[in-house]
């Protein structure tokens, strides 16, 4: 890799003091100071920031080139005057260059996105250092310049190896900005190329953009201004041309320009931007040398053709891997007031140059007026800025006091050429961050590219709508750059201020055709006259980790933090303007909503609200996340690479694109040479790291990730952080669940309360409705009673008789006669009918009487129809009554001529048609009034009212039919009413009429019906099985139903429930309870039941309520009282129930209590006596005393004891033998059984000590409890006796006996028993005290008396152990005795000798058989 030496001097006007420090390519450092103004004109601001770039010895210097390094003129042994002279010359050339460039039709532009397949290029104009560098500390990041910046990357730091930058630059994956060498002299104007002045912090160290120095296809300016940059480019790989990325820190770098006729990019002298030769090919420095008079001897001829340029660029490409540039930048940064340098666009025939003319002091406007230049000046030097741009620029200005910004410039700097230098920040204190964190320029604005047509619009006064210039956000001086397409070359270019304002006017409206384009390079515009690439900014994927490193690194370096600096790819609409090129379209506007950047304004403010933060705001182009750019990498080193030699502006191009480490040299040759590039490709080259001096070592592996790669979780946090986060989430989850549960419980509680209230309210409403309904039933019964009674009286005969009404007309009319008689008699009761008229109905032929009787019948029938529902008609509907009734069916109590019965018998067959004279009444629906019916004129005929025409239904057997018929049609026999319902006899009735008498006589005419003498017998035999009583009046039935339904409760709900449960569990009648109480008999009612009755007896207040209800209520209402109330009332009816029950209960309680006391006293008495009087107890104690004295023999304190405390008895089992085989208790028991118990081992043997269980029971007794129980029994006895006296006084005499006699006898006996138990208790206490004294026992420490529990527990433990061992030893002794007995028996048997004679088996047949059998069995 060959390294290039480039001294980039970015000037700012200095009034009082200027210290210039230079870094020779060989590493020599010189510097000089001077006072006073050092500028010949206003365009030369003096050396504000003089950056010294020195490369290490391992870098191959540019001396290999035939031309001298352009910066060597400053480092020769020449006086300051000569240097200044050279600087002034450079200034003149820079002005001329800028003038030509501005007057040219094609200016470097920037395109974004994928347009025609061309890679968008971001041309950056680096403003003069006086605008750029307020202080090196203002730079948060360094230029992502690749090898061009190698020397400037750490200008203030000690020389560092370029390996760090190679790490960041080496892997630029795609170099899409290919320069196309169309022809040797073919001019390559930048048609529609916008120059972006700044990109907020360029990509990460590994993804540093390559800043392509503007390259002109035609001749360069006389002074080879690009020599330094070309030499610097050599240090890069050929595929990675890099130019210093500009940022706000550069102030207003002069925008990059291209001379349309030049084969190389023209850089104004102010901006010593480093440029690489065509794609990665180092450009010969001589080209710039001639353009810049005397600046650099190493530059080649400015008039070189593109072919020569290509050759020159190929040379550095070959040497790219040779040099290892390590740059050292020494920077002095001084704050100067914001200044705007007017850019005058002049037209030149052969080439276009932009001359930045020296402006008067008044031309340097303060921040507030930066973008609001007068119209005259705008006319001379640029298009007038519209008010919208001015407002945007002003709004984006920051207060002068913001020191953390790129520059804190006072607004009062208007007209100032040189200012008192501020602090000089030593470059040695620069950020020590790794190489990847040293690059970056906060991009504040980017201008969208438009087609050449739009540039013409800009000249017409549009606010940079058609301009293709993009400015770095320069704190003081903005280098305007306006270029037009070649076709527009002859037209005057818009003024620089307008271009500047447009660049900074981030709030300008976005063009409708302004679109974000993808990073894919777009093909050349067909309208371009020469092969020219569309410059776009390709979004460069960057590693978020690098940005985080930048965040951590850059803000902490001596106020060098751009508090708001955003990455170079900040083309996002929210943060910065976007540069795009829209083919053919309307003017490109900066994206709306993006604040305009104003020189001298802090980056935070210029970024707009929400972007002003203490930490760098990472902004990225739409396709590139802000995380992908190394904020830390952008340090002051980048500005140091660009010290302006004469205050001019170097034109740089950014090329943003996907990471591609190297492109073929041929591809780069194809790219347009006159284009400005800003490479934003991530640099993944690992080869450069070997040649870099590591400041802070940066890991080579893992390689930087692009945006497409997924981030690993492990890279962001550790396992501990992960666990902590999980725990935190779990804790929050748990708290949230608890809160939800609490809220749920509270809500449920409230809902339950509301539900209970609603339920109570509804229950109360139900009760009120029940009472109201009850009241209405009671109130309405009387009215209905009369009607129902009259109905009941009238209905029964008809109800029964109608069952038989079946057949023809004659037989049907006969029962009516009998019914009429009963009806007359029945209707006398309600007295609603005219009795006199009814009595006249008996003659069958008396039609007048019949008609007269109709009137009261009609009235009663109408009343009945209203009161009762009409029963179903058993016959066809009769004609209406004269009074207008609907039918006669609901009027049963009619005279003999009335209609059929009301109940539903089987309908009879229709009667025969009557004569026409008798058939006249219409059907029921139209009831015509019959006014003549009360007094019919013709007694024998039908009513005079004729029927309606056309109506002749068969007349039913009704009123009018009967009127027209003779009396013979009525039944001859009266109706019979049995006393009880009888079974029906289903015969066919024959009724003899008067007509039939004239006919042939029949049996039925002469047959007489006898009277039944004993109908009761007949009724009994043939009555219905289920006797149906006569229906009572409806009023009575309703009253009964109400009584059944309603239950009156006087007790509380729970109280009533408790008493109800008691009643259901008793299974007793009240008589049994009364008998048990009166007779003091617990055989039927046990004591538990009696106690339950006593406990649940009615209290005084309850009894008052019940008694009051019984006194005030009727008998029927008393039956409605609930059972618990009735039970308590009946129980209270027993005289003195409470006193009687208490006496009976106490009788049993007393007997149980006195028995328990007696048993306890007896246990203590017996145990005490046993210990005192049993001889074996004394023997055992004596044996223990002997063994103890023997064991304690020779001991003066324990030996020779006369006795011992009984506390040792339970502890004897703990005294083990020597071999631990037995303990002392075992030996005592064995010894006692061996020597004291003569019956040991036999059934006669008796346990020598009292039973352990007796001692245990005695230990549970307390004399205090016994005394209390006795006193309690005595009190209860006296109280019960008093209650017995009360019962005897108050109870009636009949209920007094046998209660009185039994209770008196009990109390006498109870008193005697109580006195006896008291004496027993006293004796037991005395016996216990005697025992204690007898054994010499003393109370425990802290106790006054010895309690039975203490004494008897000692004996209980000892006796339990003794008994267990005694049983075992007794068994052993029994076994020994049995064994001895067996042995004695054996001895006795052995002493006796038994002689046996052997038998010869052969001689005895029997013996032989026996042997044979034995042998057989054995076999």
UniProtKB/Swiss-Prot annotation:
<keyword id="KW-0009">Actin-binding</keyword>
<comment type="function">
    <text>Plays a role in the formation of adherens junction and the polymerization of linear actin cables.</text>
</comment>
<dbReference type="GO" id="GO:0045010">
    <property type="term" value="P:actin nucleation"/>
</dbReference>
<feature type="region of interest" description="Disordered">
    <location>
        <begin position="685"/>
        <end position="711"/>
    </location>
</feature>
<comment type="subunit">
    <text>Interacts with alpha-catenin and may interact with tubulin.</text>
</comment>
<feature type="compositionally biased region" description="Polar residues">
    <location>
        <begin position="504"/>
        <end position="517"/>
    </location>
</feature>
<feature type="compositionally biased region" description="Basic and acidic residues">
    <location>
        <begin position="685"/>
        <end position="694"/>
    </location>
</feature>
<feature type="compositionally biased region" description="Pro residues">
    <location>
        <begin position="868"/>
        <end position="882"/>
    </location>
</feature>
<keyword id="KW-0175">Coiled coil</keyword>
<dbReference type="InterPro" id="IPR042201">
    <property type="entry name" value="FH2_Formin_sf"/>
</dbReference>
<feature type="domain" description="FH2">
    <location>
        <begin position="972"/>
        <end position="1388"/>
    </location>
</feature>
<dbReference type="GO" id="GO:0030036">
    <property type="term" value="P:actin cytoskeleton organization"/>
</dbReference>
<feature type="domain" description="FH1">
    <location>
        <begin position="870"/>
        <end position="957"/>
    </location>
</feature>
<dbReference type="InterPro" id="IPR001265">
    <property type="entry name" value="Formin_Cappuccino_subfam"/>
</dbReference>
<keyword id="KW-0472">Membrane</keyword>
<dbReference type="GO" id="GO:0005884">
    <property type="term" value="C:actin filament"/>
</dbReference>
<feature type="coiled-coil region">
    <location>
        <begin position="720"/>
        <end position="774"/>
    </location>
</feature>
<feature type="compositionally biased region" description="Polar residues">
    <location>
        <begin position="394"/>
        <end position="411"/>
    </location>
</feature>
<feature type="compositionally biased region" description="Polar residues">
    <location>
        <begin position="614"/>
        <end position="623"/>
    </location>
</feature>
<dbReference type="InterPro" id="IPR015425">
    <property type="entry name" value="FH2_Formin"/>
</dbReference>
<feature type="compositionally biased region" description="Basic and acidic residues">
    <location>
        <begin position="298"/>
        <end position="317"/>
    </location>
</feature>
<feature type="region of interest" description="Mediates interaction with alpha-catenin">
    <location>
        <begin position="456"/>
        <end position="842"/>
    </location>
</feature>
<dbReference type="GO" id="GO:0005886">
    <property type="term" value="C:plasma membrane"/>
</dbReference>
<feature type="compositionally biased region" description="Basic residues">
    <location>
        <begin position="151"/>
        <end position="163"/>
    </location>
</feature>
<feature type="region of interest" description="Disordered">
    <location>
        <begin position="859"/>
        <end position="978"/>
    </location>
</feature>
<dbReference type="GO" id="GO:0008017">
    <property type="term" value="F:microtubule binding"/>
</dbReference>
<feature type="compositionally biased region" description="Basic and acidic residues">
    <location>
        <begin position="425"/>
        <end position="438"/>
    </location>
</feature>
<keyword id="KW-0965">Cell junction</keyword>
<dbReference type="GO" id="GO:0005789">
    <property type="term" value="C:endoplasmic reticulum membrane"/>
</dbReference>
<dbReference type="GO" id="GO:0003779">
    <property type="term" value="F:actin binding"/>
</dbReference>
<keyword id="KW-0597">Phosphoprotein</keyword>
<protein>
    <recommendedName>
        <fullName>Formin-1</fullName>
    </recommendedName>
</protein>
<feature type="region of interest" description="Disordered">
    <location>
        <begin position="138"/>
        <end position="194"/>
    </location>
</feature>
<dbReference type="GO" id="GO:0005634">
    <property type="term" value="C:nucleus"/>
</dbReference>
<feature type="region of interest" description="Disordered">
    <location>
        <begin position="1390"/>
        <end position="1419"/>
    </location>
</feature>
<dbReference type="Pfam" id="PF02181">
    <property type="entry name" value="FH2"/>
</dbReference>
<feature type="region of interest" description="Disordered">
    <location>
        <begin position="262"/>
        <end position="331"/>
    </location>
</feature>
<feature type="compositionally biased region" description="Pro residues">
    <location>
        <begin position="890"/>
        <end position="958"/>
    </location>
</feature>
<feature type="region of interest" description="Disordered">
    <location>
        <begin position="343"/>
        <end position="641"/>
    </location>
</feature>
<keyword id="KW-0963">Cytoplasm</keyword>
<feature type="region of interest" description="Microtubule-binding">
    <location>
        <begin position="1"/>
        <end position="622"/>
    </location>
</feature>
<comment type="similarity">
    <text>Belongs to the formin homology family. Cappuccino subfamily.</text>
</comment>
């Amino acid at each position: 890799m060959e390294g290039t030496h480039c001294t980039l001097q970015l000037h700012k006007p200095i009034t009082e003091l200027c210290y210039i420090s230079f870094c020779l390519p060989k590493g020599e450092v010189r510097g000089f100071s001077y006072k006073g103004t050092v500028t010949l004109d206003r365009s030369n601001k003096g050396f504000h920031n003089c950056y010294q770039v020195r490369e290490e010895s391992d870098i191959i210097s540019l001396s290999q080139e035939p031309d001298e390094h352009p910066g060597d003129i400053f480092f020769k042994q020449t006086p300051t005057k000569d240097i200044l002279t050279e600087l002034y010359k450079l200034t003149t050339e820079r002005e001329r260059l800028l003038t030509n460039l501005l007057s040219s039709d094609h200016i470097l532009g920037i395109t974004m996105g994928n347009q025609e397949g061309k890679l968008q290029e971001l041309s950056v104009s680096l403003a003069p250092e006086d605008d750029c560098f307020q202080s090196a500390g203002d730079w948060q990041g360094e230029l992502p310049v690749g090898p061009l910046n190698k020397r400037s990357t750490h200008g203030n730091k000690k020389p560092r190896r370029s390996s760090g930058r190679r790490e960041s630059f080496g892997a630029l994956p795609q170099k899409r900005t290919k320069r196309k060498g169309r022809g040797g002299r073919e001019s390559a104007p930048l048609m529609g190329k916008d120059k972006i002045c700044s990109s907020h912090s360029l990509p990460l160290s590994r993804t540093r953009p390559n800043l392509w120095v503007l390259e002109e296809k035609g001749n360069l300016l006389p002074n080879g201004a690009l020599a330094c940059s070309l030499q610097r480019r050599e240090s890069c790989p050929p595929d990675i041309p890099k130019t210093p990325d500009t940022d706000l820190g550069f102030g207003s770098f002069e925008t990059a320009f291209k001379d349309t006729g030049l084969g190389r990019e023209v850089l104004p002298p102010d901006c010593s931007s480093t440029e690489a030769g065509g794609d990665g090919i180092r450009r010969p420095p001589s080209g710039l040398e001639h353009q810049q008079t005397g600046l650099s001897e190493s530059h080649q001829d400015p008039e070189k053709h593109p072919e020569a340029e290509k050759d020159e660029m190929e040379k550095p490409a070959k040497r790219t891997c040779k040099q290892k540039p390590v740059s050292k930048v020494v920077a002095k940064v001084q704050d100067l007031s914001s200044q705007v340098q007017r850019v005058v666009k002049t037209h030149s025939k052969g080439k276009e140059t932009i001359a930045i003319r020296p402006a008067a002091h008044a031309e340097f406007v303060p921040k507030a007026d930066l973008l609001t230049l007068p119209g005259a000046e705008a006319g001379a030097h640029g298009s007038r800025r519209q008010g919208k741009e001015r407002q945007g620029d002003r709004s984006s200005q920051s207060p002068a006091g913001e020191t953390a910004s790129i520059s804190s410039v006072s607004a009062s700097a208007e007209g100032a050429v040189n200012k008192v230098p501020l602090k000089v920040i030593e470059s040695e204190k620069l950020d020590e961050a790794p190489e990847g964190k040293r690059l970056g320029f906060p991009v504040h604005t980017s201008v969208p590219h438009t087609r050449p047509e739009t540039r013409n619009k800009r000249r017409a006064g549009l606010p940079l709508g058609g301009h293709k210039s993009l400015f770095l956000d320069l704190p003081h001086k903005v280098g305007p750059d306006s270029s037009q397409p070649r076709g527009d070359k002859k037209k005057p270019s818009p003024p620089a201020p307008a271009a500047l304002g447009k660049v900074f006017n981030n709030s300008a409206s976005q063009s409708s055709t302004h679109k974000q384009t993808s990073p894919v390079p777009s093909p050349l515009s067909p309208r371009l006259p020469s092969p020219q690439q569309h410059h776009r900014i390709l979004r460069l994927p960057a590693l978020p980790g690098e940005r985080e490193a930048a965040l951590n690194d850059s803000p902490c370096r001596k106020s060098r933090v751009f508090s708001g600096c955003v990455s170079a790819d900040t083309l996002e609409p929210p943060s910065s303007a976007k540069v795009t090129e829209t083919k053919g379209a309307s003017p490109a506007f900066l994206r709306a909503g993006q604040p305009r950047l104003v020189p001298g304004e802090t980056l935070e403010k210029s970024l707009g609200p929400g972007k002003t933060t203490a930490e760098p705001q990472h902004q990225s182009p739409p396709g590139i996340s802000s995380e992908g750019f190394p904020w830390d990498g952008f340090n002051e080193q980048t500005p140091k690479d660009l010290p302006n030699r004469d205050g001019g502006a170097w034109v740089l191009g950014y090329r943003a694109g996907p990471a591609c480490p190297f492109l073929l040299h041929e591809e780069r040759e194809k790219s347009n040479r006159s284009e400005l590039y800003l490479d934003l490709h991530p640099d993944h080259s690992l080869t450069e790291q070997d040649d870099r001096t590591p400041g802070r070592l940066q890991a080579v592996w893992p390689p930087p990730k692009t945006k497409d790669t997924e981030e690993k979780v492990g890279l962001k946090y550790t396992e501990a952080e992960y666990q902590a986060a999980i725990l935190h989430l779990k804790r929050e989850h748990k708290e949230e669940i608890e809160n939800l549960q609490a809220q749920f419980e509270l809500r449920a509680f409230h809902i339950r309360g509301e539900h209970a209230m609603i339920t109570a309210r509804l229950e109360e409403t139900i009760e009120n409705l029940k009472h109201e309904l009850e009241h209405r039933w009671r109130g309405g019964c009387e009215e209905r009673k009369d009607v129902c009674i009259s109905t009941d009286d009238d209905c029964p005969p008809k109800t029964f008789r109608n069952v038989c009404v079946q057949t023809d007309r004659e037989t049907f009319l006969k029962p009516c006669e009998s019914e009429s008689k009963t009806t007359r008699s029945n209707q006398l009761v309600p007295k609603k009918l005219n009795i006199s008229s009814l009595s006249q109905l008996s003659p069958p032929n008396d039609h007048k009487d019949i008609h007269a009787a109709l009137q009261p019948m009609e009235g009663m029938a109408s009343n009945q129809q209203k009161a009762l529902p009409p029963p179903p008609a058993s016959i066809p509907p009769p004609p209406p009554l004269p009074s207008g009734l609907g039918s006669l069916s609901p009027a049963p109590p009619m005279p003999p001529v009335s209609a059929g019965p009301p109940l539903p018998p089987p309908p009879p067959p229709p009667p025969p048609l009557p004569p026409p004279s008798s058939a006249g009444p219409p059907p029921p629906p139209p009831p015509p009034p019959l006014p003549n019916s009360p007094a019919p004129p013709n007694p024998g005929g039908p009513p005079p009212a004729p029927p309606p025409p056309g109506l002749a239904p068969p007349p039913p057997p009704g009123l009018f039919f009967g009127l027209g018929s003779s009396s013979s049609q009525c039944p001859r026999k009266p109706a019979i009413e049995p006393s009880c319902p009888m079974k029906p006899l289903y015969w066919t009735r024959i009724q003899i009429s008067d007509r039939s008498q004239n006919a042939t006589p029949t049996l039925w005419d002469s047959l007489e019906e006898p009277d039944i003498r004993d109908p009761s017998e007949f009724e009994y035999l043939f009555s219905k099985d289920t006797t149906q009583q006569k229906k009572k009046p409806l009023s009575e039935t309703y009253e009964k139903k109400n009584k059944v339904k309603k239950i009156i409760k006087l007790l509380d709900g729970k109280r009533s429930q408790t008493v109800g449960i008691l009643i259901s569990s008793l299974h007793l009648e009240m008589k049994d309870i009364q008998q048990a109480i009166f007779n003091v008999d617990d055989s039927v009612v046990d004591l538990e039941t009696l106690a339950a009755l006593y406990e649940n007896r009615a209290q005084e207040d309850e009894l008052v309520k019940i008694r009051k209800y019984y006194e005030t209520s009727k008998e029927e209402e008393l039956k409605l009282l609930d059972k618990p109330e009735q039970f308590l009332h009946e129980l209270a009816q027993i005289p003195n129930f409470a006193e009687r029950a208490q006496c009976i209960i106490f009788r049993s309680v007393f007997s149980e209590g006195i028995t328990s006391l007696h048993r306890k006293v007896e246990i203590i008495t017996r145990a005490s006596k046993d210990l005192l009087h049993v001889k074996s107890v004394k023997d055992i104690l004596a044996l223990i005393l002997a063994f103890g004295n023997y064991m304690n023999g020779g001991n003066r304190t324990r030996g020779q004891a006369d006795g011992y405390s009984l506390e040792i008895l339970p502890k004897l089992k703990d005294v083990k033998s020597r071999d631990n085989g037995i303990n002392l208790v075992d030996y005592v028991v064995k010894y006692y059984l061996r020597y004291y118990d003569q019956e040991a081992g036999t059934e006669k043997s008796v346990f020598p000590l009292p039973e352990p269980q007796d001692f245990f029971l005695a230990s549970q007794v307390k004399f205090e409890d016994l005394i209390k129980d006795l006193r309690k029994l005595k009190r209860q006895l006296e109280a019960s006796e008093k209650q017995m006296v009360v019962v005897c006084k108050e109870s009636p005499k009949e209920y007094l006996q046998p209660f009185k006699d039994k209770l008196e006898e009990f109390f006498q006996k109870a008193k005697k028993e109580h006195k006896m138990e008291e004496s027993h208790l006293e004796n037991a206490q005395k016996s216990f005290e005697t025992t204690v004294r007898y054994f010499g026992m003393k109370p425990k420490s802290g106790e006054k008396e010895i309690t039975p529990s203490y004494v008897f527990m000692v004996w209980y433990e000892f006796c339990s152990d003794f008994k267990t061992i005694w049983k075992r030893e007794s068994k052993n002794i029994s076994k020994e005795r049995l064994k001895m007995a067996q042995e004695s028996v054996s001895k006795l048997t052995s002493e006796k000798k038994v002689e046996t004679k052997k038998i010869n088996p052969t001689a005895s047949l029997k013996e032989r058989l026996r042997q044979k059998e034995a042998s057989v069995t054995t076999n």
